[in-house]
Amino acid sequence: MTDPIAAHLAAVRRDRYSDATLTARARILATLPDPLGMDRLATLAWWESRQTRPDGEPRAAASLSGEKAHAAEFWRWAMREGLLDRNPADWLPKVRQAKTMAVVVPEGDLYRILRDAAPPMRRMVALAAMAGLRSAEIAAVTWADIDRDNGVLWVREGKGRKDRSVPLSAGLLAELGEPGAGPIVGKAMNAKAVSAALGRYLRAHGSDFTAHKLRARYLTRFLAATGDAVAAAQVAGHSDLSSITRYAVASSDTMRRGAEAAGRIG
């Protein structure tokens, strides 16, 4: 095989991974000095070289974890193809990440942000905060994806190129307004443009929140109302249940009931 990295990326593309995943994986694999010929020392030396950014600052644990995952997937594919006998990622140390809770937009701020927004921006904010869509999904969703008969919004080829449905709420429909044709946000945009537009609008209105924190608001409210992590993962397009628990924020009433129950004997 003349170029194993190109062959791997072609296989990943056939599996319908997102363009963002393909770009990130190609970038990481390009740093491997000898993709199929790295022994333990070479693998550890490569890993050491990834600990700092070009500017000399240390890489964040989340970034390192992603780099390790991309390399490990490549080597796992190489083993399936009979190109390697073992996965060099087994020599790499575990990346420890701090488990942080999601930060969400306060309800008062969300009300003000929606009230002041022009229709295209109001729809972007609503799709993130009231439907839990990612920036790429907001850019792609069209009026034809609103299925009023079944009460759902269809998200076509979300993360991992997977389709899913998001239940429609009266509040979301009110913020979206009268249906039209084409993209719900009013024009063709990509994920980066949506994220940047939301960020600029939020900062202009005195908020340092982001598109992701608008999405986090939806997931925390969904979990608080249902207590159903499986349903939350499905509606959010998460394949891993463990990633949804960071959005679980217990209310003070829930914690008080728990404390009262634990404080009783018998």
Positions of PLM-derived features:
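Short pre-functional
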Residues: 72, 122-136, 152, 220-221, ...
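Basic, Lys/Arg- and aromatic-enriched nucleic-acid-binding interface segment
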Residues: 84, 96-99, 107-135, 139
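Active-site/catalytic core of tyrosine-dependent DNA strand-transfer enzymes
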Residues: 169-208, 218
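Catalytic-site neighborhood detector that most strongly recognizes the C-terminal catalytic loop/helix
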Residues: 157-160, 236-261
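Conserved tyrosine-mediated DNA breakage-rejoining catalytic core shared by Y-recombinases
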Residues: 140-176, 242
